[in-house]
Amino acid sequence: MAVRPEAIAALPVDQVMGRDRACKEPLLLGEQLFWAEHRPDQGGRTTLMRQVAAGAAPQDLTPGRWSLRSRVHEFGGGLFCASSELAVFIEARSGIPHAVSFSPGAQPRPLISGPSDECGRYADGLIDTQRQRWLGVRETTSCDQLVALPLSGGEPQVLRQE
């Protein structure tokens, strides 16, 4: 059956080309709302946003060159987690967790030192505030692991391996 041209609805170019910003992975922590925001108008990067209270202006926690992305199992996984003092996100280029505090002007810092290809791929984290560590999934070339990383930075501690 042929489709008549007059039966095809006109779609806005931005919708067809995927140029609209998209929000994903909302997280509510007390009165604070966090989300990952995909920005096609900024080279396709995904940024971490925080709104401290209803009606307050949102804050970009990963401005400029920073972008969130996980490549665990090629499909990715959870991009970020947060506590009352900081957020941890998976940085797109390195694939490793980075922490950023909520202090004005704070810059993200890696939780692991060393080349990312030796560190594995990370995702699906949470912050253990009592022990001051990030817990998450690490995929290596040989297995999947549940690991802990000190929030101050350091080497991963393997908690479980499959």
For every predicted segment, state its role:
Residues M1-A22, V52-F75, V100-R121, L149-E162:
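Multi-bladed beta-propeller domains
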Residues A10-A53:
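Hydrophobic alpha-helical membrane-insertion signals
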Residues G18-Q32, S67-A87, S116-W134:
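Conserved beta-propeller blade repeats
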Residues G30, W35-D41, Q51-V52, C81-S94, ...:
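Beta-strand C-termini and the immediately following turn/loop, strongest in propeller blades
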Residues E37-T47, L68-E74, F89-H98, P115-Y122, ...:
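A flexible loop/linker signature enriched in serine peptidases of the S9 family
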